[in-house]
Amino acid sequence: MDKHRFLVVVLAVLVQLAAVFGAARAESTTPENSDYSQPRLPVLVETTMDLGLSSARGRDQRSVPPTPVVLGIYQPSFPNDLSQLSDYERRSGRKIPIIHWYAQWGGWKSAFDRNDLEAVSARGSLPMITWEPWTGSAQGQPEPNWSLRNGILSGRFDAYIDSWARGMAAYGKPVLLRFAHEMHDHPFYPWAVGINGNSAEDYLTAWRYVRGIFARSNATNVHWIWNPHVIAGASESTYESTYRALYPGDSEVDWVGLDVYNTGPDLDWGSARWQSLAQVLSTPYRAITAVSSKGLLLPEVGSTENGGSKSQWITTALTTELAQFPRVRALVWFDVDKEQQWNLNSSQSALQSWVAAAAQPRLSADVSMFLLS
């Protein structure tokens, strides 16, 4: 490389660094860019500029390593009983970084319990809580008392929300909180748009209302997940318009989420056919990444045994297909025998596939790297 070319390259790199750090500083000091989330580290933009360091055979063609993905598991016994995790971890030789459970405002795990969070943190894992404003006992029923206007927006739950906000702030360590998920036209959930007279504006107002209570308690350790659901057979434009109408905005959200199920031929809320993870995820992924700039989590993932090889589904999903979706940063398995045998030990071959895939270096990212990304 001649001296003139070297100086040009150095100048270009310095300009890029100045732009990145200048943007980061502006973001941290401009009121309209402030939000309730923790400060995030600035990420340097990669440069593809040829610095003249390639070999005589041409430029280095090595690919950039895929983005690390953090694994997690949900089981109905969590967080009270974490014993099943020990077997999974012993088999794979890896800790499960994310432990997921559900908390219903009027039912299971209603009260904030710091002991649950401490137990998960003590084992080196990150808590993920799906926080549901309902009783959980009347699935398929509207529960009009839990509509957004009769519930959250009436102020009826302010003291309850505040108890969680203050508890989270006192706990102080990171928590992933998935609030009021799958919020569009879902017949199960009284907070969903189209149920109990809830509108998109009601949902957006409720989201910001709850976040505001957490902000006043300085619960900045909470990472908020906005998680719509996958609409079987919908077009990309339908997905995008639906998501856009319900998205609170990047300043109100830390992560976005999508739930991915291979329902096979048996469930009418699925595709009624066997689908790979890539087939289920591709269209909603394009839509949600067009609507939001945030990283994507998959808080519920499962496959049936009926209609194909679940073992192969797991292997392909975790070893090959995830790389097609670079914004995905976590995959949490729905380890439950429920509508289908979503559970990992539904067959010995399925469990063996999970154990083998979970041992990949790409799927062993630690939680600190995940939170700073």
Language-model segments: which ranges?
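Substrate-binding cleft of secreted/luminal carbohydrate-active enzymes
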Residues: S63-P76, G295-S373
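N-terminal module-boundary/linker segments of secreted carbohydrate-active enzymes
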Residues: E27-I98, Q360-S373
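Glycoside hydrolase catalytic-domain groove-lining segments
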Residues: A111-E132, S251-G307
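Alpha-helical scaffolding within the catalytic cores
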Residues: P79-Y88, K109-A119, A159-W164, V230-P248, ...
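Hydrophobic faces of well-ordered beta-strands that scaffold small-molecule active sites
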Residues: L71-I73, P97-W101, P127-I129, V175-F179, ...
